[in-house]
Amino acid sequence: MQVSPAIVKGIAVSSLGLYAGILTSSTVISITTPINVLTQHLKNVLCTLGCWSTVLGGLATGAFGLSYYLAAPGERPNYLLCGLGVAPLSAAYLYLVSLFNHKLAPKCTRDQNDLEKQKDEKLPQHHPEVKDGEAACPFSKMNNAKTLKPESERSVKCHSYMSLHMSIVTGITIFTFGKCILDGFKA
């Protein structure tokens, strides 16, 4: 069974587009939302979304790899190989950065400046007001009326560290997505 090059290109661009979109939206949410809202009100929702996004990205990358493998050897576009590795490599990189950040987090001291920055962070425009100990996210059944353990909270410094790495990976993913599309027009 052989797959035509057009189908391989279509699956490749769809897979990369899906992954780039998921990563971009996650990065924008992480950067624009104050850390106290992320950790106290949206943590479980974002973790669930992250798990399902990983599964969806894995399935799309698997379909891409399978279609590439099933294509005739002479009709496999080489420029798509870099796109095939983006999702697994960036997911592994972000996972390792996250593990390092969790190990580093207890060492990230929460000095008074960090606490003041966290309290002064503004919500995005038109966002309903969220106060500590008040209205948890309605979509997170597991988080309602629960308080987080003090050791699970992150300082502003540790949060910005993770946001920086997410931004870098998002930029690389979008660049690779654009490159695969533009190289597809040349081929």
Swiss-Prot record:
<keyword id="KW-0812">Transmembrane</keyword>
<feature type="transmembrane region" description="Helical">
    <location>
        <begin position="11"/>
        <end position="31"/>
    </location>
</feature>
<dbReference type="InterPro" id="IPR051668">
    <property type="entry name" value="ATG33"/>
</dbReference>
<keyword id="KW-1133">Transmembrane helix</keyword>
<dbReference type="GO" id="GO:0016236">
    <property type="term" value="P:macroautophagy"/>
</dbReference>
<feature type="transmembrane region" description="Helical">
    <location>
        <begin position="162"/>
        <end position="182"/>
    </location>
</feature>
<dbReference type="GO" id="GO:0005741">
    <property type="term" value="C:mitochondrial outer membrane"/>
</dbReference>
<protein>
    <recommendedName>
        <fullName>Protein SCM4</fullName>
    </recommendedName>
</protein>
<comment type="similarity">
    <text>Belongs to the ATG33 family.</text>
</comment>
<dbReference type="GO" id="GO:0000422">
    <property type="term" value="P:autophagy of mitochondrion"/>
</dbReference>
<keyword id="KW-0472">Membrane</keyword>
<dbReference type="GO" id="GO:0005739">
    <property type="term" value="C:mitochondrion"/>
</dbReference>
<feature type="region of interest" description="Disordered">
    <location>
        <begin position="114"/>
        <end position="135"/>
    </location>
</feature>
<feature type="transmembrane region" description="Helical">
    <location>
        <begin position="80"/>
        <end position="100"/>
    </location>
</feature>
<feature type="transmembrane region" description="Helical">
    <location>
        <begin position="45"/>
        <end position="65"/>
    </location>
</feature>
<feature type="compositionally biased region" description="Basic and acidic residues">
    <location>
        <begin position="114"/>
        <end position="134"/>
    </location>
</feature>
